[in-house]
Amino acid sequence: MTDFKTIIARLAEGRALDAAEARAAFEIVMSGEATQAQIGAFLMGLRVRGETVAEITAGATVMRERALRVTAPANAIDIVGTGGDGVGTWNISTATALVVAAAGVPVAKHGNRKASSLSGTADALQALGVNLDIDPATIAASIEKAGIGFMFAQAHHAAMKHVAPVRADLGIKTIFNMLGPLSNPALVKRQLLGVFAAEWVKPFAEALRNLGSDSAWVVHGSDGMDELTTTGPSAVAELKGGSIRVFEVTPEDAGLPRASIEDLKGGDPEQNAAAIRRLLDGEAGAYRDIVLLNTAAALIVSGKAATLKEGAGLAAKAIDSGAAKQTLAKLVAATNGKNNV
């Protein structure tokens, strides 16, 4: 096995790690065999030089192998972002996940508490009454009954406890900010994945291809959002059939108006939960529009829609029919041990 000091020495020279070296390094880190100082040096060495697709793939592979697994249908999708975009919007991926499920696509959503906003996916779902403290069998049953299940990252990646103190002490983005969205415990092969910078859309798509995904959109909004934005264009790297295509989309492609970033600013978990409820009740406005856009993308990834315009229409129908509101009610019931779903 590669010695961890040797790996750190290679990083200190500015060298990229090959797949075997990177895998060995993450095995050492995630098994608790590295000291806190070594982990800090490792993370900083990667960050200063710039993380490679091979290193990201290796880290995500090790995290997936060590995760507490969940069973999900083969056509399930994850709708997830790296977080840390600093924009502080409403919970867009959370609301999108509910609408996608209501449109008939099973969702195995992986997420955590807030990164840079006031409210992360876990915070908002908890405020909506979803029980996060459930076992893999209950999550699988939730996906079956409600069409959606939520996997709380910290409950599924126990090995992260070895790096948590160092990450907190460093206070900067590290490779682990990238690995979470790539480490879905249900091993889904379809993703709508938002990243914190445009230069990462293609590398993330390449990593997803390496990890076995068959269909994905990796996106970044021109306003900095780790979502498709309605304030302007968004960069997209599409993975389909083993090929990656990079292009740009606008809200107009989905027949939607542009919004200002102020219209999309979120609040604390309770405020964001209330906004989701209003959205599911059919409230019009900028929040609904951005959820329609992101749902449309997820429906393209899932093969349910051919275009953003078609997908946005299906998303609107899922909300206006009451199906999305019912999906939330089913999710709350399924995670709280109630059978009336």
From Swiss-Prot:
Q: Where does anthranilate 2 bind?
A: R167
Free-text remark on how the cofactor is bound? Binds 2 magnesium ions per monomer.
According to the UniProt record, one GO cellular component term is: cytosol
Which residues are Mg(2+) 1-binding? Answer: S93, E227
Give the pathway listed in the UniProt entry for this protein.
Answer: Amino-acid biosynthesis; L-tryptophan biosynthesis; L-tryptophan from chorismate: step 2/5
InterPro entries noted in UniProt: Anthranilate_Pribosyl_Tfrase (IPR005940), Glycosyl_Trfase_fam3 (IPR000312), Glycosyl_Trfase_fam3_N_dom (IPR017459), Glycosyl_Trfase_fam3_N_dom_sf (IPR036320), Nuc_phospho_transferase (IPR035902)
Which Pfam families does this chain map to? Answer: Glycos_trans_3N (PF02885), Glycos_transf_3 (PF00591)
Which residues are listed for anthranilate 1 binding in this entry?
G81, N112
- Give the residues the record marks as binding Mg(2+) 2: D226, E227
Q: Where does 5-phospho-alpha-D-ribose 1-diphosphate bind?
A: 81, 84-85, 89, 91-94, 109-117, 121
Task: Identify the cofactor(s).
Answer: Mg(2+)
> One of this protein's GO BP terms?
L-tryptophan biosynthetic process
Which reaction(s) are listed as its catalytic activity?
A: N-(5-phospho-beta-D-ribosyl)anthranilate + diphosphate = 5-phospho-alpha-D-ribose 1-diphosphate + anthranilate
Superkingdom field: Bacteria
- Keyword Oxidoreductase carried by entry: no
Q: Sorted alphabetically, which keywords does the UniProt record give?
A: Amino-acid biosynthesis, Aromatic amino acid biosynthesis, Glycosyltransferase, Magnesium, Metal-binding, Transferase, Tryptophan biosynthesis
Q: What class of enzyme is it?
A: transferase
| Single GO MF descriptor | anthranilate phosphoribosyltransferase activity
Q: What EC number(s) does its UniProt record assign?
A: 2.4.2.18
Which NCBIfam families does this one have?
trpD (TIGR01245)
The role this protein plays is: Catalyzes the transfer of the phosphoribosyl group of 5-phosphorylribose-1-pyrophosphate (PRPP) to anthranilate to yield N-(5'-phosphoribosyl)-anthranilate (PRA).
Q: Please give the PANTHER family that the UniProt record associates with this protein.
A: ANTHRANILATE PHOSPHORIBOSYLTRANSFERASE (PTHR43285:SF2)
Query: Member of which family?
Result: Belongs to the anthranilate phosphoribosyltransferase family.
State whether it acts alone or in a complex, and with which partners, per the record: Homodimer.
- Protein name in UniProt: Anthranilate phosphoribosyltransferase
What organism, scientifically named, is this protein from? Parvibaculum lavamentivorans (strain DS-1 / DSM 13023 / NCIMB 13966)
Q: Output the lineage of the source organism.
A: Bacteria, Pseudomonadati, Pseudomonadota, Alphaproteobacteria, Hyphomicrobiales
